[in-house]
Regions:
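A short, N-terminal "cap"/entry segment at the start of jelly-roll beta-barrel domains
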Residues: 1-63
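Conserved short histidine dyad/triad with adjacent acidic residue
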Residues: 57-78, 108
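Short acidic-glycine-tyrosine-enriched beta hairpin
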Residues: 63, 89-112
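Tight coil/turn sites that cap or link beta-strands
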Residues: 67-69, 101-102, 107-110, 116-118, ...
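A generic structural signal for residues embedded in beta-strands
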Residues: 74, 93, 104-107, 228, ...
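Glycine- and acidic-residue-biased ligand/ion/polar-headgroup-sensing regions
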Residues: 77-94
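Double-stranded beta-helix
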Residues: 116-160
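Conserved catalytic SET/PR domain of SAM-dependent protein methyltransferases, capturing the structural core
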Residues: 153-294
């Protein structure tokens, strides 16, 4: 997904190829030009788009909260599925529009257009799968530009990622454990379980800190429960997938029969197709909580 803000005249600066796009021009772009257009738009600041993942028996719903006044290029849908617009108003590329409430079967292809009013859009798929990466490989066909962007972000080296890895080594000494022990614990699969049915604001993806991590897909407020990490001794992705940080944005809390992860501060979510902040914890703190349950 690529999304950027336009002004009241439907114009936005796009660099380096052109300086402005008129709304009428945008709505008449030929589909074969979309990938080039998408690459141009990736040079712009992307708008926040909360993506919330809903899991229920036999159903995965991908909710996107689309801000008014933006032009959106969605990922290509690989299969027919149910579309639900709970509220909002979208004008589509090439003509046509949808006003909520609206429901229809979405055919394979890309949806592009201007968000005329704040919109809640749901893609609904028939599946029992709960891993977002697997779900995306099943139902989405991302462009080369989108894939390249994800790889670049996963390999980004920042002061924060360097500090996280350095403090990880200090944490090993503090807890008197080895990297091999921590890696083996994270990789152990016999105690893994799926998340309970419900709605979640995160996903797992390759991390610039280490291996795979957990990233916010929607804005999470300080004090908000992100989800369960441990349920009666069984671990969810929050229990085995969160990376350590010297400056964590989340912490572990003991609950009746398990452990939950709570936001320590506000955590930013997706900006269009760009993942939000990586959710991190201090393993020293989470270890203390785990030991208290024994």
């Amino acid at each position: 997904m690529t999304i950027y803000r336009v002004d009241e005249n439907g114009e936005a600066s796009v660099k380096p190829i052109v300086t402005t796009f008129d709304f009428a021009e945008l709505m008449n772009v030929h589909p074969v030009d979309l990938e080039e257009l998408e690459q141009d738009f990736m040079t712009l600041d992307q708008e926040p788009v909360d993506v919330i993942h809903h899991f229920y028996p036999g159903i995965y719903m991908r909710e996107a909260r689309l801000p008014k006044g933006c032009f959106l290029i969605g990922h290509k849908q690989a299969k027919p599925h149910l579309n639900l617009m709970l509220n909002g108003y979208v004008g589509f590329l090439g003509g046509g529009e949808a006003k909520g409430p609206f429901m229809a079967v979405g055919e394979p292809g890309r949806k592009c257009g201007v968000i005329r009013e704040e919109t809640a859009w749901y893609n609904i798929y028939a599946t029992d799968e709960t891993d977002i990466g697997t779900l995306e490989s099943m139902f989405l066909e991302k462009s080369d530009a989108a894939i390249a962007q994800e790889i670049e972000l996963a390999q980004a080296e920042t002061d924060e990622t360097v500090a996280a890895r350095a403090d990880y080594l200090s944490m090993l000494l503090d807890l008197d454990v080895t990297h091999e022990m921590v890696s083996a614990m994270s990789a152990y699969k016999d105690d893994r379980i799926n998340l309970p049915w419900g709605a979640y604001k995160f996903r797992s993806a390759p991390s610039p800190i280490h291996g795979n991590g957990v990233f916010a897909s929607a804005r999470i407020e300080a004090g908000e429960t992100i989800g369960p990490a441990n349920i009666n001794g069984k671990r969810t992705v929050l229990g085995y997938g969160i990376n350590h940080s010297a400056n964590p944005n989340a912490y572990a809390v003991a609950t009746h029969g398990g452990i939950s992860v709570v936001a320590k501060r506000d955590i930013t979510g997706n900006r269009a197709g760009v993942f939000g902040e990586e959710i991190t914890m201090d393993y020293r703190q989470s270890r203390k909580v785990a030991l208290c349950l024994r």
